[in-house]
Amino acid sequence: MITYHPETNVLEAARQRISYIFDNFERIIVSISGGKDSTVLAHLALVEAHKRGRKIGLFYLDEEVVYQATIEQVEYLMSLYPENTMRYWFQIEFNLTNSVSLTDGQVHCWDPAKKPLWMHKRSKANILAAPWSHKTVIADKNKGFGYYDVITNFEMNMPGTAHLVGLRAVESPNRFRAVTRNPGYKDIMWSTKAPCGGVSFYPLYDWNYMDIWKYIGDNNIRYHRYYDFCALKGVHPAQMRVSSLTHEKAYRSIASLPEFEPETYEKLLKRIKGVSFAQETAKNKKMFLAQKLPKGHSSWREYRDFLLKTYPDKDKLPIFIRRFRHHLDNEFVARQQCRQLVLNDYENDLPVKNTEDPIIQKINFWRDVL
């Protein structure tokens, strides 16, 4: 049980949490993405490791189709305290959701057949093949060996490990409620159980947006260049994402990619089909945003049925059909289903809010009143 003084701020609390983890676990691994939250968490953990003369792992799953600035940021974190860092930079083959192509539902990262088109080079200093000795576990054969499968197998290969993740409650309340339903370690509610006796901890769970940037500024830490670009463009903080360029929550970044990193955009054009179309329509309300019905369609339900009928990846189609069977049949839900389909969101990273149509509810309310 960790107790805090009433005047303890979030930074002091996070340091106490990380110290507690160091006291109770021999092996600690921090997941990093190049984003601001994992940058702060990695720095806090590395400072504690340096103070104790211990080593911790930094885990980065390289999705290949990423900003060059992301690679630079990850290299920066890996080199901050080299004497205290174990490098778990994975550059292995796996499947990734592809929301920018209407024909290819997945990107096969580090595909040997596409080596001349790889977005950036692999390094001998990184992990280039699956390091685990157990039989590889794949959650869904239809999806193949995917992003989360890599993480699961890595955690299975690291029994009894403390995995630190930069999840913040204010950024993803629904996800945080899901992971904090039951304590993963003793009575620590900001933790969840991981495979093989491991535990995932979220030491920054109560930090807000300004806490993150204050820590970065106070400690003069380098951060991803994309944040400055977005700030100058007036992008809302919630839309500043540095994940893969084909992710269903980051596809709009492609609209500005030619301006931010023109060389990366040129490589992406050659690597993935449909990028040019996605770049032109990323902010189109009729396409990826699914905010307006395209011409020729009279309702969202009719448009959804059309998309299901013409969905190009027949292996992934049953995933959507099974999921949609559990949804209500109204226009509000159907519009969200259309968005999942046009973004190839078979992973359900943009879950449908399965409720009654609020417009119909409002109409019925006023009918009763009047």
Feature locations, PLM:
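Nucleotide-activated chemistry modules centered on ATP-dependent adenylation/adenylyltransferase
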Residues: 1-31, 36-370
